């Protein structure tokens, strides 16, 4: 999961046509830097979200975004594309996401993100494919993501969503699981215990995670950091994602430690790099630079884009829109 780039790259789409944005996203020129491709992606997302008022343009934006799945070599970009499609709330994206989730030629990190996006869309028509992948996919992260997506769709449409009293979140993202409801009145130690209990359903552990995120204190951050000891790579990558959302320097030491784990799954390390870029505190620069030649593509690319984010956060630029090239 990856939303922490969006707040840095989203700009008004008036500067480019949809076709120009598509050409930037798919790197038609062969010369477009990765950061500009992300900028184009999030601009197209803005259009795709307007399906209620501009259905034809929104559908075209979905189609243009989906072109990235065809021949692109950047696993990082494709997984971000899947994430973005899920966040649009536009069900026109569901058929493409189902295809990507089931396509064994796509990288597991991309297929996992496609499954998560189907959960974010709340697409009931995807339940059969999600159940199939949850049982049969060869990669555990994809199976676990399908389990979460199934639970989220059932929570959305089964009545629980309307009955629970959830804290008003500071974050606009549609997450893999909702936070635990306020009526649970759990303390931070209790939430930490649930977070780290492998006997509990993954969906419930995620709910504890997002409740801790919404609390957002240093104590909650330290509780979340204990989740980096979990066995599940999917779970650990979500902890890193949450830290990027919170944006607190208190999370930096644990993120640096996780990024440095050479034996760790790439999806975890890359998410830690993104989170460090989103936090954008001065001490992260040298750390990110030290991984610019990392042997893992998604880690290296995440550091490149994270440093671009840092430069923007610490510049006086007022405009950060893509340019056609």
UniProtKB/Swiss-Prot annotation:
<feature type="modified residue" description="Phosphothreonine">
    <location>
        <position position="187"/>
    </location>
</feature>
<keyword id="KW-0597">Phosphoprotein</keyword>
<dbReference type="GO" id="GO:0005634">
    <property type="term" value="C:nucleus"/>
</dbReference>
<keyword id="KW-0479">Metal-binding</keyword>
<feature type="modified residue" description="N-acetylserine">
    <location>
        <position position="2"/>
    </location>
</feature>
<keyword id="KW-0503">Monooxygenase</keyword>
<feature type="binding site">
    <location>
        <position position="270"/>
    </location>
    <ligand>
        <name>Fe cation 2</name>
    </ligand>
</feature>
<dbReference type="GO" id="GO:0019135">
    <property type="term" value="F:deoxyhypusine monooxygenase activity"/>
</dbReference>
<feature type="repeat" description="HEAT-like PBS-type 1">
    <location>
        <begin position="77"/>
        <end position="103"/>
    </location>
</feature>
<dbReference type="InterPro" id="IPR016024">
    <property type="entry name" value="ARM-type_fold"/>
</dbReference>
<feature type="modified residue" description="Phosphoserine">
    <location>
        <position position="126"/>
    </location>
</feature>
<feature type="repeat" description="HEAT-like PBS-type 5">
    <location>
        <begin position="268"/>
        <end position="294"/>
    </location>
</feature>
<dbReference type="GO" id="GO:0046872">
    <property type="term" value="F:metal ion binding"/>
</dbReference>
<keyword id="KW-0677">Repeat</keyword>
<feature type="repeat" description="HEAT-like PBS-type 2">
    <location>
        <begin position="110"/>
        <end position="136"/>
    </location>
</feature>
<feature type="binding site">
    <location>
        <position position="113"/>
    </location>
    <ligand>
        <name>Fe cation 1</name>
    </ligand>
</feature>
<feature type="binding site">
    <location>
        <position position="80"/>
    </location>
    <ligand>
        <name>Fe cation 1</name>
    </ligand>
</feature>
<keyword id="KW-0007">Acetylation</keyword>
<feature type="binding site">
    <location>
        <position position="271"/>
    </location>
    <ligand>
        <name>Fe cation 2</name>
    </ligand>
</feature>
<feature type="repeat" description="HEAT-like PBS-type 3">
    <location>
        <begin position="202"/>
        <end position="231"/>
    </location>
</feature>
<keyword id="KW-0963">Cytoplasm</keyword>
<dbReference type="GO" id="GO:0000226">
    <property type="term" value="P:microtubule cytoskeleton organization"/>
</dbReference>
<keyword id="KW-0386">Hypusine biosynthesis</keyword>
<feature type="binding site">
    <location>
        <position position="238"/>
    </location>
    <ligand>
        <name>Fe cation 2</name>
    </ligand>
</feature>
<keyword id="KW-0408">Iron</keyword>
<feature type="binding site">
    <location>
        <position position="79"/>
    </location>
    <ligand>
        <name>Fe cation 1</name>
    </ligand>
</feature>
<dbReference type="InterPro" id="IPR004155">
    <property type="entry name" value="PBS_lyase_HEAT"/>
</dbReference>
<keyword id="KW-0539">Nucleus</keyword>
<feature type="repeat" description="HEAT-like PBS-type 4">
    <location>
        <begin position="235"/>
        <end position="261"/>
    </location>
</feature>
<feature type="binding site">
    <location>
        <position position="237"/>
    </location>
    <ligand>
        <name>Fe cation 2</name>
    </ligand>
</feature>
<comment type="similarity">
    <text>Belongs to the deoxyhypusine hydroxylase family.</text>
</comment>
<dbReference type="InterPro" id="IPR027517">
    <property type="entry name" value="Deoxyhypusine_hydroxylase"/>
</dbReference>
<comment type="pathway">
    <text>Protein modification; eIF5A hypusination.</text>
</comment>
<protein>
    <recommendedName>
        <fullName>Deoxyhypusine hydroxylase</fullName>
        <ecNumber>1.14.99.29</ecNumber>
    </recommendedName>
</protein>
<dbReference type="GO" id="GO:0005737">
    <property type="term" value="C:cytoplasm"/>
</dbReference>
<dbReference type="InterPro" id="IPR011989">
    <property type="entry name" value="ARM-like"/>
</dbReference>
<feature type="binding site">
    <location>
        <position position="112"/>
    </location>
    <ligand>
        <name>Fe cation 1</name>
    </ligand>
</feature>
<dbReference type="Pfam" id="PF13646">
    <property type="entry name" value="HEAT_2"/>
</dbReference>
<keyword id="KW-0560">Oxidoreductase</keyword>
<comment type="function">
    <text>Catalyzes the hydroxylation of the N(6)-(4-aminobutyl)-L-lysine intermediate to form hypusine, an essential post-translational modification only found in mature eIF-5A factor.</text>
</comment>
<feature type="modified residue" description="Phosphoserine">
    <location>
        <position position="281"/>
    </location>
</feature>
């Amino acid at each position: 999961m990856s939303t922490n780039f969006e707040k840095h790259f989203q700009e008004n789409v008036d500067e480019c046509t949809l076709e120009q944005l598509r050409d930037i996203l798919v790197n038609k020129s062969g010369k477009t830097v990765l950061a500009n491709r992300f900028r184009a992606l999030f601009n197209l997302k803005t259009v795709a979200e307007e399906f209620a008022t501009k259905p034809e343009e929104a559908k075209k934006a979905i189609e243009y975004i989906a072109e990235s799945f065809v021949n692109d070599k950047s696993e990082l970009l494709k997984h971000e594309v899947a994430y973005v499609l899920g966040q649009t709330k536009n069900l026109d994206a569901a058929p493409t996401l189902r295809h990507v989730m089931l396509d064994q030629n796509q990288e597991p990190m991309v297929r996992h993100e496609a499954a998560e996006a189907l959960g974010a869309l709340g697409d009931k028509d995807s339940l059969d494919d999600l159940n199939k992948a949850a049982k049969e996919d060869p990669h555990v992260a994809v199976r676990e993501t399908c389990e979460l997506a199934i639970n989220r769709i059932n929570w959305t449409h089964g009545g629980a969503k309307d009955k629970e009293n959830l804290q008003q979140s500071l974050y606009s993202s549609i997450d893999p699981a909702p936070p635990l409801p306020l009526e649970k009145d759990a303390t931070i130690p209790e939430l930490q215990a649930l977070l780290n209990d492998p006997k509990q359903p993954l969906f419930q552990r995620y709910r504890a995670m997002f409740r801790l995120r919404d609390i957002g204190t240093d104590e909650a951050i330290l509780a979340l950091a204990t989740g980096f000891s979990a066995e599940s790579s999917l779970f650990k990558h979500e902890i890193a994602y949450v830290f990027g959302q919170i944006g607190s320097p208190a999370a930096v030491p644990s993120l640096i430690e996780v990024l440095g784990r050479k034996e760790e799954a790439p999806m975890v390390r890359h998410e830690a790099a993104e989170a460090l870029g989103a936090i954008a505190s001065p001490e992260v620069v040298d750390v990110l630079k030290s991984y610019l030649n990392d042997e893992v593509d998604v880690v290296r690319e995440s550091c490149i884009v994270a440093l671009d984010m840092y430069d923007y956060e610490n510049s006086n630029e007022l405009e950060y829109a893509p340019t056609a090239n």
